[in-house]
Structure formats: structure tokens, C-alpha cells
């Protein structure tokens, strides 16, 4: 019995390690997809943070993670860097963007913030953010990497001129938020499978 338990534990651990390795690969790959070739390092930068359904009254785990990704994605070489927080009141009374803005300030961020508070989908996040990012020389769309690439693809569809300014955010750190990474990779795989049908 003990031997069987050890074997089952080893199998479960191997499966979990394999799943995590797959999720890390998905994040690493998608963090490099749908980028532009015309960003200007040292110029004006807009970091677009895509929101996630949030009941409030404080930012939930996913939105806190996304804000942290947005903050660390800002370039110290940018002449100006603005955080563009996206998301309407989808899961509660307060827009996701406002919840994320509060959290960014709690983390000590004192720089400029622009809020997009009307959107209910990723496509709307991007469409509604366009006026807020149009003057930026470099644009970074961040979330978890498989979600961020969806946002970047929407920008390519809507405004290829702006999409050429897309640069990579810091959204694919090895070993970070493993449960969130696995969930995001599974959602991305299901979405891709549905699109193929």
C-alpha cells in the first residue's frame, strides 16, 4: 500500500510539473507575439493594463497581479510613462480600472494614470484605450501573457499604425503565480481550440 501511495504521489508530482512547464512555455511564447517594430525606447510610453471581472470593493488577486505587471513593465528610460488602466463595472459597482488605480497608488505609484472605465470585454478595453495611447511612442499591453497577446492582436486589427509601436511588457517571469499561469494557459488553449472549430 505504501509503495502504491509513493507511486501515485510521484505520478501526481510529475503531472503537476509537466502542467506547470507547459504553462510557462505558453506564457514565454505569447509574451513575444504580436509585437511591433517601431517603438521608440526613451520616448513617451503607455502601459495598458487589461482588467479582470472584479466585485470590489478592493482589487482582487488577478487585478492586483496585473497592476504589478504594469508597474514593473514601465521603462526607466522613457521620457514619460503613463499607466492606462482598463475595465468597467463588470463584476461590481466600481469599475475595474478604478480598483486597479487605487491599488497602484497603495503600491506607491505616483505617476500619471489614465482610466478607461466603460469596457466590458478585452476588445472594448483596447478600442476604448486608443484615444488614451495615441500619442505614445511605445505601447505595452499587459495582463497575463496569453491574455495580453489577445489585446495586442485587437490593436493590430483596429489600429495597425499604433500596433507597430507595441513593445513587450514584463509579464512572463519564470515561476511567478503558477496557479494563475496554468489557468491562463488552459483558457488560452480552450479559446484557440474553439476558434479552430
Give, region by region, the residue ranges found by the protein language model.
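A structural signal for short, hydrophobic/glycine-enriched beta-strand patches
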Residues: 23-188
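Hydrophobic alpha-helical topogenic segments used for membrane insertion/localization
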Residues: 1-26
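Charged phosphate-binding loop/patch that engages nucleotide di/tri-phosphates or the phosphate backbone
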Residues: 192-197
Amino acid at each position: 500500500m505504501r509503495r502504491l501511495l509513493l507511486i501515485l504521489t510521484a505520478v501526481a508530482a510529475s503531472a503537476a510539473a509537466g502542467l506547470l512547464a507547459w504553462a510557462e512555455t505558453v506564457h514565454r511564447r505569447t509574451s513575444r507575439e504580436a509585437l511591433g517594430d517601431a517603438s521608440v525606447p526613451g520616448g513617451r510610453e503607455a502601459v495598458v493594463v487589461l482588467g479582470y471581472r472584479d466585485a470590489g470593493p478592493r482589487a482582487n488577486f488577478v487585478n492586483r497581479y496585473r497592476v504589478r505587471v504594469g508597474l514593473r513593465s514601465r521603462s526607466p528610460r522613457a521620457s514619460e510613462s503613463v499607466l492606462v488602466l482598463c475595465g468597467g463595472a463588470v463584476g461590481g459597482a466600481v469599475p475595474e480600472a478604478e480598483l486597479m488605480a487605487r491599488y497602484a497608488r497603495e503600491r506607491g505609484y505616483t505617476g500619471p494614470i489614465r482610466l478607461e472605465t466603460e469596457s466590458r470585454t478585452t476588445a472594448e478595453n483596447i478600442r476604448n484605450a486608443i484615444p488614451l495611447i495615441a500619442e505614445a511612442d511605445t505601447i505595452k499591453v499587459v495582463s497575463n501573457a496569453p491574455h495580453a497577446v489577445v489585446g495586442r492582436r485587437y490593436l493590430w486589427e483596429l489600429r495597425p499604425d499604433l500596433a507597430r509601436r507595441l513593445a513587450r511588457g514584463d509579464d512572463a517571469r519564470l515561476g511567478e503565480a503558477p496557479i494563475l499561469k496554468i489557468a491562463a494557459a488552459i483558457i488560452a488553449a480552450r479559446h484557440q481550440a474553439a476558434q479552430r472549430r
